[in-house]
Amino acid sequence: AWGWQSAFIAAGVLGFIWVIFWLRMPKNSRVKLAEESAALAQAEKEEARASIPWRKLLAYRQSWSLILVRFLTDPIWWFFLFWLPDFFSKHFGYNIKESALPLIVIYALVTVLSILGGTLTKFLANRGWSLNKVRKISMLVFACCVVPVIFVQYFDMWTIVAVLGLAGGAHQAWSASVYTLGSDMFPKSDVASITGLSGMAGQIGSVLFQTAVGFTLSWFAAQGNASHGYDIIFMVCGSAYLAAFVIFSLIIPNINMVAPRER
């Protein structure tokens, strides 16, 4: 009733409200866990150390493992965000302007399942598994949860909604693991740099992939079979995470902090 602009305005207003709760520094907060207080105190005791220059970061295999992982998988999330309305229109003749229920359900599932992904990592860690095993088993599970999107052409609409919701939630859980890998392999003074560097790679990959998606769909539309273009694209989406997992595992057989001699 208020137009699409109202969605952005509402989100912005809620964002400013949320900022109010973050104006106070953590050490001044009255609501704080003992573990958090101890971590903050320890961080303040650590001596400041110069970060690794960006150009030197590129010499480390740990850096390239994260760069390649995000280059391959970040684009899939942006595909899910941008192209799904067009997919439902092409595949089912669904008019998203009349009802956005499928998309609402998908993103609601993403929200819930992304949180559950963190419980898996915590569960494995509580069993006494090594960091390497916890991270890689979790990433493998999340990667496998995206694989079913390869077969969307064989599913009915609501099965596709469930599959895409699972895939989106798995991506968010995957991303959380990838972000954490930066702090697993680099000292805290370098985490921001490696996160920014790998994030840049992810966005470059996203631009290239969305452009390729557009050209692919246009070509198949010209052949009179626009929905078949999506079949190919979903095959790429479903295999990207497993490919990224294999590449990461080959580059980083064991997840460890960068050794002093490597710095």
Predicted regions and their residues:
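C-terminal transmembrane helical hairpin of 12-TM major facilitator-type secondary transporters
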Residues: 132-178
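Extracytoplasmic gate region of multi-pass secondary transporters
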Residues: 60-117, 167, 171-180, 206-214
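Helix-loop-helix hairpin linking two adjacent transmembrane segments in secondary transporters
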Residues: 1-30
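A late C-terminal transmembrane helix in Major Facilitator Superfamily
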Residues: 114, 183-222
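Interfacial helix-cap and linker-helix signal at transmembrane-aqueous boundaries
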Residues: 1-2, 88-89, 120-121, 125, ...
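Juxtamembrane intracellular "pre-TM" segments in multi-pass secondary transporters
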Residues: 31-67, 91
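Intrinsic disorder in cytosolic terminal tails and internal cytosolic loops
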Residues: 32-49, 129-132, 251-263
